[in-house]
């Protein structure tokens, strides 16, 4: 049975009332789950990120990152980078890591977001085609690591099976799941999902490296003599997956972290890649004062290459949580299903940057390499993604 005094200490006494209405099996499951939780840490998260949340309005320690602009590279530089990139890919120096833990809910679609199809071509297939082309050009089959989540893991694997892995070698596609963390109400209370269990949500893309390690894939990369991990997410329909120019730029610069960015539009709600206290990092749009956000010229588009040695040395180090507030369905006090604002705590992959020692950025043309698919209609929508894919002759 739940410890009422312990629950009251951490503002979770409502669970004691819930328990009175539960069956024996439900009570046992709730008790077991609560025993696994560190209620003090959960309360600290709530206080730090919600009650005392703040934006960054002091930018005295924030400066522009060092970056090169792709459009300013001359033909000789482009050729040199591309040839070095092809050579590195041919020699097996790169693995590709895709973050694809989301659902297509905001697109009005029930399956994994990566399985969403635009005129018959899914987001997964758009990326698989590029890996197939690289294999044809280099003779090397790149290992493709795909991070899923509890909500879409089985469906993602099944989708790949149904589509015969898009003619890519299934032995070189590796799926693994990100971890979860509890969600809270705006009052700081644990909430129950529709099944009557304590609600947990994916812990954000920042868990990608620990999850990769837990699955044994960091060890595999070392055994395969991989030197770099190319990282991207499923949202960007124009992503150039491990394009040889960027691969060559990465190898030539030989930094812990190599990033792609675009020039942001004024007040565009996308994170800014900046330098803070001599470390590159991403400041989320929501964390920056609106008067400050337009001072910086590099918008983060979630495309990076990491030295494997850097990731293995930093993977176990602590990352901070960030707050997101979402409308989520849950049980109310009478076990009825309601939709309420819910606090989600997320890790961001770019917080690992703080442990790096060397950084470089390549700013690329937005119209060629960035078209996020986030909404069913309007901005960053199915329509805009479709138009951009057609413009680039990708569908």
Swiss-Prot record:
Keyword rRNA processing: no
CDD domains: UDPGlcNAc_PPase
EC number, as in UniProt: 2.7.7.-
Family to which this protein belongs: Belongs to the UDPGP type 1 family.
Key words, A-Z: Nucleotidyltransferase, Transferase
InterPro entries: Nucleotide-diphossugar_trans, UDP-sugar_pyrophosphorylase, UDPGP_fam
Protein name as annotated: Probable uridylyltransferase SE_1761
Root EC class: transferase
Nucleotidyltransferase is among the record's keywords: yes
Binding site for UTP: 99-102, 113, 178, 204, 235, 344
Sample GO molecular function, one term: uridylyltransferase activity
Domain of life, source organism: Bacteria
